[in-house]
């Protein structure tokens, strides 16, 4: 109805200059946003502070969210040159933060660059380096890639030419750069562009609560294609995937 929600506005000591990201995990929704007071905040749906991560400088880019085997992980960069990764409770992931040596200028995105089942984190700094890290914080092979001009913006990753490997697209101060990573990879269902999707919703729903649906011991039914009020076993048998 346009009214300010109970518990809001949330007040920090400086200004927010980025789009917030909403995370849903374990039946809870919370808001994440970095602030010019050097702090990354997570805010519960009732307006209370969930956690706060202090960094060494301002935060001017939105977070990226990655589903891991232990639930969602929240990645964000700071102008202190570090790329951070935390759990929904604000605890640092093993191997993080990573010191890149230069200001983080774009939101991180994700893809399985070498198709080994473990995604990589792609980011850029205010200098001329394109950075890719493995989930444990170690650098991807042949990274960083150094360019002649500084980057300006967030990367996106996709298999543009349908050859099975991944291209990284990112803007610079004078051009659009495309980097063809020669390893076979996949973007899968990963947050592979700014704010997660083409609609730029900045919303992430964790898949850890998913369940398997079965009918008469037949799993994985296509419920979209299942007609209503059909009980005959013959007709039902044609709809499982």
Where are the regions a protein language model picked out?
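N-terminal exported-region signature
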Residues: 208-241
């Amino acid at each position: 109805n346009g009214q300010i929600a109970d518990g809001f506005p949330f007040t920090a000591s400086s200004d927010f200059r980025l789009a917030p990201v909403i995370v849903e995990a374990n039946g809870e929704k919370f808001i994440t946003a970095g602030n010019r007071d050097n702090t990354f905040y997570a805010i519960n749906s009732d307006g209370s502070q969930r956690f706060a991560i202090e960094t060494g400088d301002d935060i001017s880019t939105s977070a990226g969210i990655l589903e891991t085997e232990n639930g969602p992980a929240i990645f964000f960069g700071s102008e202190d040159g570090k790329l951070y990764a935390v759990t929904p409770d604000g605890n640092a992931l093993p191997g993080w933060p990573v010191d890149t040596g230069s200001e983080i200028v774009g939101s991180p995105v994700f893809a399985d660059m070498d198709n080994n089942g473990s995604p990589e984190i792609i980011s850029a700094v205010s200098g001329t380096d394109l950075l890719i890290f493995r989930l444990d914080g170690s650098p991807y092979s042949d990274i960083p890639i150094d360019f002649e001009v500084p980057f300006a913006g967030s990367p996106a990753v996709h298999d543009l030419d349908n050859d099975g490997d991944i291209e990284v697209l990112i803007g610079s101060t004078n051009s659009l750069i495309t980097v063809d990573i020669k390893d076979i990879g996949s973007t899968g269902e990963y947050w592979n562009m700014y704010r997660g999707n083409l609609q730029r919703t900045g919303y992430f729903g964790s898949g850890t609560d998913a369940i398997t649906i079965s009918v008469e011991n037949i799993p994985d039914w296509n419920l979209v294609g299942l007609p209503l009020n059909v009980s005959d076993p013959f007709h039902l048998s044609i709809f499982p995937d």
